[in-house]
Amino acid sequence: MGTIPTKIAIDAMGGDYAPSEIVEGAIKAQEAYGVKVLLAGDPQQIKASMNHRLSQPLPEIVPAEDIVEMHEEPLMAVRRKPKASINIAMKLVKDKQADAVVSAGNSGAAMASALLRLGRIPGIDRPAIGAVLPTMIPKKPVLILDVGANVDCRPKYLDQFAVMGTIYSESVLATDEPKVGLLNIGEEPSKGNDLAVRTYQILQENNQIKFIGNAEGRDVLSGKFDVIVCDGFAGNILLKFAEAVGDAVLQMMREELTPGLSGKIGTAILRPNLKNMKQRIDHVEHGGGLLLGVGGICIISHGSSKAQSISNAVRSAKEAVENRVLERINSKYLLEVENQ
């Protein structure tokens, strides 16, 4: 008998291009990564998006009667709509019918649904969204967390983010002794606001991580750090700025290389290099951020995600499941809870 494929539940109705692009991405992922995809959403709309596809088997459809819209207040909508697609997808993980969830819908709703249905890992005060960014060193990405789950943080939250980030970096990114940094406005321990100064002291005393000091904005993509922690307010701004810079660089390259015969010749010569560069800096390649600290694997993708981004998000979910990220965080904090 073959190995049982990883099962990924996808919120098929979440996102600006749902369900068509979500379905397309699910099919791509199922073909590319050998996973089994379960699509939670309106069966009629999902089937309509599958009509042109001949590949077999197609993802399984799990009916959901409602949708949490992007403009809705997340917690209220999640509670008021128990049969919304995001809730059905989360329930599949809770009931162990799926191993992970991917959603490009209302990110606040995804977090609220995860907390209500999957709960927090014992010992974790707040979950965090971790995003992987490329650095100037090939194949040496940096994990930033939190990038949006918690606008306001306490030092102990960032300390927990550092531990969870270290586990993820070791498990999924195959980093040996991840070097942890604290996002700040200077290198000195005394620099920054009250949160930064107090967090620095706590991280320095944490023997579960390899804390090497403050990370300034210029250090983020340098390759010096493997994990950088910050509050969700600063992290979200950092993430979106980095993605915008990546988009701008790609657009500038297209504009400079396309005009005239010389541009076409240059493009042809540089095509392999340009393709590699695009794969490194295009945020679509990373698919989404992992919600760390909840009792299940949950990937939160951009609302603007299209098929390729969804497919890559499924890949990220599969990697987190197969590298037992949840179990490793659980075991780390279970020991702490028992020793308290």
Swiss-Prot record:
Q: What is its EC number?
A: 2.3.1.274
Chief location of this protein within or outside the cell: cytoplasm
| SUPFAM superfamilies, per the entry | Isocitrate/Isopropylmalate dehydrogenase-like
Which UniProt keywords are present, listed alphabetically? Answer: Cytoplasm, Lipid biosynthesis, Lipid metabolism, Phospholipid biosynthesis, Phospholipid metabolism, Transferase
Superkingdom classification of source: Bacteria
- What GO terms are given for molecular function? phosphate:acyl-[acyl carrier protein] acyltransferase activity
Location within or outside the cell: Cytoplasm
Concerning Pfam families, the annotation shows: FA_synthesis (PF02504)
Q: Which reaction does it catalyse?
A: a fatty acyl-[ACP] + phosphate = an acyl phosphate + holo-[ACP]
The biological processes this protein is annotated with in GO are: fatty acid biosynthetic process; phospholipid biosynthetic process
Which pathway does it operate in?
Lipid metabolism; phospholipid metabolism
Among InterPro entries, the record links this protein to: FA_synthesis, Phospholipid_synth_PlsX-like
A Gene Ontology cellular-component term = cytoplasm
- The first-level EC class reads transferase
Q: Record's family?
A: Belongs to the PlsX family.
What does the UniProt function comment say about this protein? Catalyzes the reversible formation of acyl-phosphate (acyl-PO(4)) from acyl-[acyl-carrier-protein] (acyl-ACP). This enzyme utilizes acyl-ACP as fatty acyl donor, but not acyl-CoA.
Question: How would you summarize the oligomeric state and partners of this protein?
Answer: Homodimer. Probably interacts with PlsY.
What HAMAP family does the record tag this protein with? PlsX
Q: Mind telling me what this protein is named?
A: Phosphate acyltransferase
Species of origin: Trichodesmium erythraeum (strain IMS101)
